[in-house]
Amino acid sequence: MQLHILNNPKDAALAADAEFLKQSLFNLLHEEASPLVVETVKLLSTSDDSAALIEKVLPQLDERQTYDLTLACGLFAQILNIAEDVHHERRRQIHEDAGHNAAEGSLTETVRRLKAGKADGKSVQRQLDNTSVTAVLTAHPTEVQRQTVLNFNRRIRALLPQRERCTNADALARLRREIDTVLLGLWQTSETRRHKLSVNDEINNGVSIFPMSFFEALPKLYRKMEHDFQTAYPDVRVPNILKIGGWIGGDRDGNPFVSGETLRFAFRRHADAVFRFYRSELDKLYRELPLSIRRVKVNDDVMALAALSPDEEIARTEEPYRRAIAYIMARAMGKARSLGLGMGCKFGFLEPYASAQKFLDDLKKLQRSLIDNGSRLLAEGRLADLIRSVSVFGFHMMPLDLRQHAGKHADVVAELFQHAGLEDYNSLNEEQKQAALLRELGHQRPLYSPFITYSDHTRRELAIFNEARKIKDEFGEDAVTQSIISNCEQPGDLLALALLLKESGLLAVENGKPHSRINIVPLFETIEALENACPVMETMFRLDWYDALLESRGNIQEIMLGYSDSNKDGGYVTSSWCLHQAELGLVELFKKYDVRMRLFHGRGGSVGRGGGPSYQAILAQPAGSVAGQIRITEQGEVITAKYADPGNAQRNLETLVAATLEASILPDKKDPDAKLMQALSDVSFKYYRELITHPDFIDYFLQTSPIQEIATLNLGSRPASRKTLARIQDLRAIPWVFSWMQNRLMLPAWYGFGSAVETLCEGSPETLAALRGHAQNNPFFQAMLSNMEQVMAKTDITLAENYAGLSESPEKAKVIFGMIKEEYRRSRKALLDLLQTEELLRDNRSLARSLALRIPYLNALNGLQVAMLKRLRKEPDNPHALLMVHLTINGVAQGLRNTG
């Protein structure tokens, strides 16, 4: 392990942690692996060309040794991740304890900037009242690690900070033994899934984050928000500006296994988790509030609750708060029982709360009484946190969005029209479709009849909307609030969804005006769709019917923007610019029609799917596009990295809120030169499309990446492609990006950029100067280049050439790889020119250090992957080769800390 990289005194503790874990892993290898494997791993730690070392050693290894070597390299990546996570937390705590200036991206710093920017309390309160930030957890299959493996990692992460606190050799030896024990369990556990995840598995995985993290992190973060704001603005109150949302169980786009049943299962699991949390917190409150009426006064409304209490122990006669809490718990658990949840209550069950608000009202009575009668500290502790939790989580824990492809909605509408004796919907042009849909939306009568036999597809689609209606009735109105139309291209796509909502009782016409219980959200995802977003929405805003519908939803229109497909469609530069342009256009359009806009950013974990640091990404949004309202998807390995630990979760959510407030209240940002950016986009698009439309490109991609093996990894419940793969557009964006990361090209995040810069700057020093100026001063361009720099630092063209050797047509591969290699050279040169530096990551020491530590094991895993792919292509039925490929895919993803 290249610990000489950690020569900065600030990294001394990281070096010690890494060495400590390394020694534990070597202890394990000496016991569990052959001497040849142990020696090879030791050589890798100091090798300058670990892929070449693997190529030399591999012929000497049998199947068991190959497995052990691959697993060992992957485990080194995992323990380095853990050591770095612990170190980040350590440095943050040291920074905070030393009283240094608040870090960028913290709420403390944001509030300081607001105060320095002369924002007064009224304007801050107004902004907070109009702020809504949601991190939306999705089931997109990008988490390669099993939950079992993640649990082992969490145990090591919890143990490692104890190393610094060990004061003698015996304590250190005990800690060593504990970590050795966890590592042995990890070593003897299968790293890969043997069976495909079901939708219910994904739901359970998503729910598990809440008791592990969110139930603790959100109340703490709200408490910090209140402290930070009230320190600067004493009269400001913090409403519920931050929530967690989800898609898991309601996202049907491309997933035939999502249904009304999975939606119901999801909310039962949500409710089970949140009611167990409430029961636990109420039980703790019961123990913390034995206040006696001999010692304190108690408000009448709390005495009234106590009088209804099922807790009739004689010792409780003088303890009204405990009696009131027993009453509240019995009613809350009564609600849990009415929802079919099998959990008990030591006080029995009383009439269920009709809503989370009623539950909240009773808790607030306790708080008010404590404050009124001199017990403010007790009121502002656990009770305040529980009140905040109930107001945020309700009975549903997190809302789920519904999502389906526009074409699937259209199929249902067409069948409803057919059986109702109406016109042939599919034969209508767009204008005729709009007219027909508006006509039907104006009628009270439904099109659906229970006496007609419909196709399975239509029955399933209507069933999930009907289930959503029932869930809203049972779990609360906030349980399901959005229905997203993926691949939205025309106004008729929005009206078609509206008709399905009407057929399901989620949209009604009252006194000639529509009223919807769910937001209709178009998702614009391809380059063409992004360019057409404004015309589509302007058509909708001109409709009196839709204007009335928006009025019923608070005059807010949510728009979802797709980063993944637009990138696959046009490359990173063009995708980034088209998204920016679409947002600028939408800002002006919404102002024109006096509609409030909320943007929902469909970002992935990788740069090729819109990933990158959230703080910079939000601040780089066009002026006026945030305005306090933002939703962002979080998925797969991102959920694990950001939110599996309460401390990490709190900091990452704090960053989202801080960036949203800064972008909304301090929107003084320079728009990039539109003419210059458009020219850069056009040339980049040209070169990118030349590559992916090359007649030999698809075969090259399939043969020189593990795309087909990724499809067999059992990462998620939905298929890897929408149909038989014959074109790039048939492939989902996740495996597309995932594959390019595995073969170390990261192509979707930079291809075309170098040629664009070279073309524009040739003979034009003014253009070069302008681009350099943007690189220094423009948030949009800075974020683009920063993300590209991080990706190019992980790119290894030499390793990628080894993958090119997997092609069945060496001459054709030589042409395609030659194009890629030359564009990489140009893009790297252009990036360094614009950043005016001689090396990548010069200003990102943390990432440079992280990559340097991982490189020996990461490159070894790539070398193993190439060898195993070569073997698998020759022997397609070789189970060992397939297992090894799967194991290397896991390991490379861990080494890069990214998948798709």
Curated annotation (Swiss-Prot):
One of its GO terms (biological process) is tricarboxylic acid cycle. Gene3D superfamilies: Phosphoenolpyruvate/pyruvate domain. PROSITE patterns: PEPCASE_1 (PS00781), PEPCASE_2 (PS00393). The active site is at H140, K568. It is an enzyme of class 4 (lyase). One of its GO terms (molecular function) is magnesium ion binding. GO terms for cellular component: cytosol. The keyword Magnesium applies. Forms oxaloacetate, a four-carbon dicarboxylic acid source for the tricarboxylic acid cycle. Belongs to the PEPCase type 1 family. This is Phosphoenolpyruvate carboxylase. It comes from Neisseria gonorrhoeae (strain ATCC 700825 / FA 1090). The gene is ppc.
